[in-house]
């Protein structure tokens, strides 16, 4: 920057420097300046005057004055605009050209809120304006619609806050179509060019503010084939996270399993084909899912195959391995079509860059992971609590020590789909073991991971053409940390999981990409991409030439300010810039009458007058043209850089997945090292042996007392344990901690115990508590029986079954009979590893009939009327439930408690010895 330019900058933000050299400024004024130089002339000029690298100077400006703010006309209420409450009620030919264009676009997206860019606002009209104003509590205004039309409803949001408002609309279950400006200056006599650039739906959003950082945002598509004759109900599902690039497909049977899978996935949006006349929400679709329907054509086999071939630029689909899952293939085709339709102006599609860069679809088979149905996930509180749906108090809350968003998502996926392969489990264990033993390495890795950005999603935004300059800088920062992470691992880990290879053998092009970003972008670029100030000097000769010309204009402005001070005799005169009024000369009210004749009054304020001169007005136009060319050139250079980064999205994501997995393992090691965990012995046996094990969540929630550990032994000699004990003694907690330890072991984590041997389970079943399902017309007892039936139909000898009461919601004899029969079937026929907590003490008799059944009880200490829960599990069955004592502790009135004791004593006198009636020796099993 020249001395005179610095002088002008100082005057814009304070007083004029007293040592200003008026003569040098005068020389500058007379110098001829051109703003019509060709690109080549500008390049040549930049070579003659090379620039020193520095952050480009932003255009000086002053805040908007309150009296210059545009005031919107506000309708008194909705009834002021009764005739035009819907866009279909108006004749498009009578509308203004802009509103006619709006209506044309709205007709293509009738089910979406259309946000139409007008200057600094995104506006809605007609029914969208009314809905927007009500949902977001915005002022409903009006806009002139045309001759014979009058005012039509209008509501809008500032463009810089559009993301926040769109997030709210999506949370209300709506989708949004964004119509943006495609040019900055319209052609002569034409409207500014605008078109739909993006469609935002719950499953397709990419903006950081619309996503939950520590969980995936799944978009799913499903194709079903109903049962016909001997053919079962079949379905194919494709689910993608467009923000991370993950793309999974699966194909299975059974409507109940589809419902379970969708409930487990917790997709943000589900797409399905719908024929005319079909119900909008099938019975297998969970109520909470955001459902979007499409035409059936994209889901047909030929169309889906064409879509996949075009999207991935392939000549054959053989390499994708989808031949054996045709329904999943069709679902994948429908999903990709939907993504294409929601990104109508995605950049560079013709050059082979996908609008939403997704990995090749990965087929997931039914036997790849431990099966956890929706009921088990709720009962074990894997990612949220059962009572109020909170994250705190869940298993993930207890064991998540990840430092990156991608690591947190990885750990969540691991917990939702534990491994079945003992080799893969041991590979994770090996890394965790080494990190636990090597504290310095663990802490060093955590220091490197802590500031790491979300490379997965950043790469996705770059690949889709949505990343800003700051996001590219964050990508460069993340890439620069990868070699240091790899170096730490190379030196420490002799054997590591295969997926860490993407980090250990880093793609050599990535460091070069980071260097390119650093070379071009300044370290802290502005949020806006259209106002310049993004790129370093010496990046592009044309940009340097334009900046040289702008510096010359700044020098002219500084000289003009000095000259006008001399001519006016006013040393306090200031030359300033206003984003609405442009450049002007500002003087106080007292000096306004003394200005030269060639000054033209531009604006009057309370304390000052603002003027322009013919020379200043002419020069203003030249500056605006130069500035527009410079900003446009910077944007072009930035888009080229973003495209360069987008082409490397796959490589970045591969490295990011490795970092995410490493972060998850480092976090598990931190939990193990600080939580007194042990490394479980994993094998393919049916045994589950836990010494002094603890509940991983409850022990962290206890503040005033320590958790009481207990032992567990199943699968060797004993397959079923009948667990009895008082109410509120900890039976349910004991069941859950067994299930959580089994799950953690199959994740590859250490477990809260002194010693553990864990045989791999194929499924974990839980039936803990029940509530009415009034919507489905089912009572508590029917819900309980349905859950029990599901367990009995699907459990195997390798399953872990955890039951907390069966048969409570019916008559005592009926309930006890059901509980006995279920327990007997699990132990004798299925031989599943089972713990059955019950208040039917008669079930203790089952151990006398079956050698693989044992009794355990939760101990209590009774002193007079006082009852102390010891929370210790010991061998042997309890003969009392202490329900009346528990009722007293809960605050039941004393007279009711005393009456309950009288009734209990009478019932004991009339007892008919139920165990004898239910003895297997006296009940014949009928074939």
From Swiss-Prot:
InterPro entries: DNA_mismatch_repair_MutS, DNA_mismatch_repair_MutS-lik_N, DNA_mismatch_repair_MutS/MSH, DNA_mismatch_repair_MutS_C, DNA_mismatch_repair_MutS_clamp, DNA_mismatch_repair_MutS_core, DNA_mismatch_repair_MutS_N, DNA_mismatch_repair_MutS_sf. GO terms for biological process: mismatch repair. CDD domains: ABC_MutS1. Keywords: ATP-binding, DNA damage, DNA repair, DNA-binding, Nucleotide-binding. PANTHER family: DNA MISMATCH REPAIR PROTEIN MSH1, MITOCHONDRIAL, DNA MISMATCH REPAIR PROTEIN MUTS FAMILY MEMBER. Belongs to the DNA mismatch repair MutS family. This is DNA mismatch repair protein MutS. It comes from Prochlorococcus marinus (strain MIT 9303). The lineage of its organism: Bacteria, Bacillati, Cyanobacteriota, Cyanophyceae, Synechococcales.
